[in-house]
Amino acid sequence: MTILNHTLGFPRVGLKRELKKAQESYWAGNSTQEELLNVGRELRARHWQQQQQAGVDLVPVGDFAWYDHVLTTSLLLGNVPERHQNADGSIDIDTLFRIGRGRAPTGKPAAAAEMTKWFNTNYHYMVPEFQQGQQFKLGWTQLLDEVDEALALGHKIKPVLLGPITYLWLGKVKGEQFDRLSLLNDILPVYQQVLAELAKRGIEWVQIDEPALVLELPQEWLDAYQPAYQALQGQVKLLLTTYFDSIGHNIDTIRALPVQGLHVDVVAGHDDLAVLHKNLPKEWLLSLGVINGRNVWRADLSSWFERLQPLVNSRPLWLGSSCSLLHSPIDLNEETRLDAEVKSWFAFALQKCAELALLTQALNAPNDAKLAELAAYSAPIRARRSSSRVHNAQVEQRLAAITSQDIERQLPYEARAETQRKRFNLPAWPTTTIGSFPQTTEIRGLRLDFKQGRLDGKNYRTGISEHIKQAIAEQERLGLDVLVHGEAERNDMVEYFGEHLDGFVFTQNGWVQSYGSRCVKPPVIIGDISRPEAITVEWAKYAQSLTEKPVKGMLTGPVTILCWSFPREDVSRETIAKQIALALRDEVEDLEKAGIGIIQIDEPALREGLPLRRADWQAYLQWAVDAFKLNAAVAQNDTQIHTHMCYCEFNDIMDSIAALDADVITIETSRSDMELLESFEDFAYPNEIGPGVYDIHSPNVPSVEWIEALLRKAAQRIPAERLWVNPDCGLKTRGWPETRQALANMVLAAQRLREEQI
């Protein structure tokens, strides 16, 4: 039996972020829809060809998305929120962008769809909205059009479709509450129609993604799989596809399904391959996700060969990426500045395709030459284990010396709050922002010129100082109470810290999609982490010298730096987080010495770091909270520690949020209409809270009345004396005109509420 290989998906954005540039040009009115569509066509054709040339047997089609693949699925099913619908019920690419960005068909603002993390990754999807009695129809034929495109280009393909149960699981009920699973029978006819269309095109296999099967699903959701897949069987072969964790706990449900194959993630999952093989119907195809789609490390192909060889010829077998390569940068060959040793440890999406091809060839026709090729390929990643670039004895000693006293503040919150009130004397409903201000073309140009050597250090610092001065002046003029320096010097909240810490390396083109047109370039953690010198102190001290009002020191927390980097795989995540915490603990101490009295330690990724299964949560939360406290607890009692979290659902982790013992927490709540505050109310959260009062991901400017209404809603749940007033998130991606207007409205809303209290 010949083994084939395939990928579950490929990065969409393009090596030079061509998709991002085309999207933003179109949104700004600088290019036509046809020009945008052409960029998409060119990228798809290039990516299919590149995968095929790298040795991929079946290229995925349907993994491309103009904004997000879950949103694409919503449109496929005709699921468009009423506020975004065209008058004639038609669906086009503008419908898709309106849902993602927040505009009505008239051009007036309409709330964007809620956005949240895709399982435990750094990718965001647009949350489908469901209403009772909703109608579904095949509304958007992007998948079929792209299948036609790929077939016309002569590719051997495997269409990709998000499965019906995972799709419903990922959504939220809007309006009157009901069980969204009850919509299953309404969406299945659309899936049947799509599969019938694919069958007409001669498609043999369809990858139907059901990553919800790695979760601990309620029994009624598990029970829904059998009738759902009964309804979908017969027209094409279905490869039931799971990723991000193991499936052993749901194996009884899975093996009874009328599908022809199963894909499992054997990188993130811990399923025993022999047990899996034994438990599955013998005629099923088993696709093994052996190449990590979520990290940048070269695979040890020799080890995989040894592990997989016993399965060869025992059943139909495919090899694949563990998950979509969406989460990987595209091409390591474009990296010209990486040190040769470090570069030899990496593999990006195209190299991962080549790894699949190499391993498949060796398993199909093992001989000495092939095995030697695998050994030569695997040698650098094996040599890394003993590299001096990886190990730092001093860091290891410091980690071993941590005691329980190192992670506790000196006084409890109530006593600290009193000393902080005396020190800062802030008004009721204090206003602040989350940290960053608009990153103008001028700011980005300044950083780029400095990075590429066109600008010397002195002139760079002068330029950044001017932007900080402007940010402070703007905030003074607006009447904000606690200021920030605006982060003009920072390219990215994680990359900036990584650049100043030992143990990290950076890529030139290692872009991955975060959401919509937003791309990030995660640092890579290659070894033990330490801080050679202060990182943020110079700019924080300068900003504070410009104003009598308190200026926040701004740090990215240890868990977020870990979650938003490509981590090492040779030590635990806990070890990495605590190494970062120790480095940033020194930064907190230095900020205090420089006179900074309010220090924000952002942990937007705390929740997304949760393991997918609850059974594993407690261990993670314990070390994640300890890492934050290790970072913060060095602060004096009159230093106010803030933290910021976004895209979070808090209900199930409130104990841990409270255990962080931050003096103030700011959270993203506007898109969920203050829903998140219910968790804090039910828990009787003891410290101060800044619920985000407007959505910075949308260009819409909130009215004073809108903000006031949200704050009143917040005050029904949290005592007003413990409420802060702030946007949802940093303002880096917004323009100055809308930022000024939105913040002016926010300050005015706070002032009105203060006046009511007098």
Swiss-Prot record:
SUPFAM superfamilies documented for this protein: UROD/MetE-like (SSF51726)
Co-factor: note: Binds 1 zinc ion per subunit.
InterPro entries in the cross-refs: Cbl-indep_Met_Synth_N, Cobalamin-indep_Met_synthase, Met_Synth_C/arc, UROD/MetE-like_sf
EC class (word): transferase
The name this protein goes by in its record: 5-methyltetrahydropteroyltriglutamate--homocysteine methyltransferase
Pfam families: Meth_synt_1 (PF08267), Meth_synt_2 (PF01717)
Cofactor(s) essential for the protein: Zn(2+)
Name of the gene this protein is made from: metE
EC number: 2.1.1.14
Main function: Catalyzes the transfer of a methyl group from 5-methyltetrahydrofolate to homocysteine resulting in methionine formation.
Reaction catalysis annotation: 5-methyltetrahydropteroyltri-L-glutamate + L-homocysteine = tetrahydropteroyltri-L-glutamate + L-methionine
Binding positions (Zn(2+)): 644, 646, 668, 729
Binding site residues for L-homocysteine: 434-436, 487, 602
Family, per entry: Belongs to the vitamin-B12 independent methionine synthase family.
